[in-house]
C-alpha cells in the first residue's frame, strides 16, 4: 500500500481561527485559543495520521506589524515555515474585508512560489452573497490553487479541505509514529495551558506581557500526582497585582482552570503550583526571550 505525506503551513493575520482549525482537525487541544490577538507565539505542529497518509500541519503566529523583539520573533517564525512546507493554507475571516495585513502576506506568498489554498473561515457569520464577494476580491489578488470556505468552530467543510490536501499529497515517508500528535514536549504544552487561562481571565493590558516558564515537572510518589511548578512572568508590578488578584483569588482561578486542562492532556492527577514574577521589558530583550522559549533558532 502506498503511503503519502506532506507538510502544510497555516498562515494568516492574528485571530482568524488558525488554532481553532488545527485543534478541530486533531480532535483535541494542542494549540491554545483566546479572543486576544497574537495568542499563538510559537510554531505549533499538529500531526494528522491515517493508515495511508500523514499531514504535518504547522500552525503559525498571527502575522502583524511587530512593535517588540517578541513580535519580530513571531512574524519571522511564521514566515520561516514557507521554507519547510509543500502547501500553504492562507486563512482569512469571512466577516472582515481584505486589509493591508492580508496584502502584505499575499506578497510574501507570491514570492515563495509554492501552492497556496485560500481558506475562508467563519462562514457561519456571513450571508452567502458576502462570501462570494470575499472570494472574488481575494482571487483578484493572487492565483490560488483552490479556495475553500469553512467554519473551523463548527467543522463545516473541514473534511472537504482535508480530502483536498490528502488527494494532493505525494508518496513519502511516515515522519512520525501514528500515535504522536505534536512535536512539542509536555512542558511546553503545560506552559501554554497556563498562559491560555491568563489570556481568558485578565484585562487587555496584561496578555501581551505574559510568559509562562515551567520550572519543574515530576511525579510525587507520596501523593501519586504530577507536581508542576510554573512561573508567570510579567513586565510591570501592576500586572503582577492583576494576575494575583485580591487575596490571591485570580491566581487561584488561573491555576484551577489550567490544572483541569493539564490533567486531561496528561491523563493524570496534577498538583499545580503557580508564582508570578516581574521581568521588566522582557519582550524586547533577546536573552529573556530565549529563556522564555522564544528562540531565534526555531527559524
From Swiss-Prot:
Keywords: Cell membrane, Cytoplasm, GTP-binding, Membrane, Nucleotide-binding, Ribosome biogenesis, RNA-binding, rRNA-binding. One of its GO terms (molecular function) is small ribosomal subunit rRNA binding. Residues 59-62 are annotated as: G3. Residues 202-280 form the KH type-2 domain. Residues 150-152 are annotated as: G5. GO terms for cellular component: cytosol; plasma membrane. It comes from the Bacteria. Its main location: cytoplasm. Residues 4-171 form the Era-type G domain. GTP binds at residues 12-19, 59-63, 121-124. Pfam families: KH_2, MMR_HSR1. Residues 121-124 are annotated as: G4. SUPFAM superfamilies: P-loop containing nucleoside triphosphate hydrolases, Prokaryotic type KH domain (KH-domain type II). An essential GTPase that binds both GDP and GTP, with rapid nucleotide exchange. Plays a role in 16S rRNA processing and 30S ribosomal subunit biogenesis and possibly also in cell cycle regulation and energy metabolism. Belongs to the TRAFAC class TrmE-Era-EngA-EngB-Septin-like GTPase superfamily. Era GTPase family. This is GTPase Era. It comes from Streptococcus agalactiae serotype V (strain ATCC BAA-611 / 2603 V/R). The gene is era.
Amino acid at each position: 500500500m502506498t503511503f503519502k505525506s506532506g507538510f502544510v503551513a497555516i498562515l494568516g493575520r492574528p485571530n482568524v481561527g488558525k488554532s481553532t482549525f488545527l485543534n478541530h482537525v486533531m480532535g483535541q487541544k494542542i494549540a491554545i485559543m483566546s479572543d486576544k490577538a497574537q495568542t499563538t507565539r510559537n510554531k505549533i505542529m499538529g500531526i494528522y495520521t491515517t493508515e495511508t497518509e500523514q499531514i504535518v500541519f504547522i500552525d503559525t503566529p498571527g502575522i502583524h506589524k511587530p512593535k517588540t523583539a517578541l513580535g519580530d520573533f513571531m512574524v519571522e517564525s511564521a514566515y520561516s515555515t514557507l521554507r519547510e512546507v509543500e502547501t500553504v493554507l492562507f486563512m482569512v475571516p469571512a466577516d472582515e474585508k481584505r486589509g493591508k495585513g492580508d496584502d502584505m502576506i499575499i506578497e510574501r506568498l507570491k514570492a515563495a512560489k509554492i501552492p497556496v489554498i485560500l481558506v475562508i473561515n467563519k462562514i457561519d457569520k456571513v450571508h452567502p452573497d458576502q462570501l462570494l464577494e470575499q472570494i472574488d476580491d481575494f482571487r483578484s489578488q493572487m492565483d490560488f490553487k483552490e479556495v475553500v470556505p469553512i467554519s473551523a468552530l463548527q467543522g463545516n467543510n473541514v473534511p472537504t479541505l482535508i480530502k483536498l490536501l490528502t488527494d494532493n499529497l505525494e508518496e513519502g515517508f511516515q515522519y512520525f509514529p501514528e500515535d504522536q500528535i505534536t512535536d512539542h514536549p509536555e512542558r511546553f504544552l503545560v506552559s501554554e495551558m497556563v498562559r491560555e487561562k491568563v489570556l481568558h481571565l485578565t484585562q487587555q493590558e496584561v496578555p501581551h506581557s505574559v510568559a509562562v516558564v515551567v520550572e519543574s515537572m515530576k511525579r510525587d510518589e507520596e501523593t501519586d500526582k504530577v507536581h508542576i511548578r510554573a512561573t508567570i512572568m510579567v513586565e510591570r508590578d501592576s500586572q503582577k497585582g492583576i494576575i494575583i488578584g485580591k487575596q490571591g483569588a485570580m491566581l487561584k482561578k488561573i491555576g484551577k482552570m489550567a490544572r483541569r486542562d493539564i490533567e486531561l492532556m496528561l491523563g493524570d492527577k496534577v498538583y499545580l503550583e503557580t508564582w508570578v514574577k516581574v521581568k521588566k521589558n522582557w519582550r524586547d530583550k533577546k536573552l529573556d526571550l530565549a529563556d522564555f522559549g522564544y528562540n531565534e533558532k526555531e527559524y
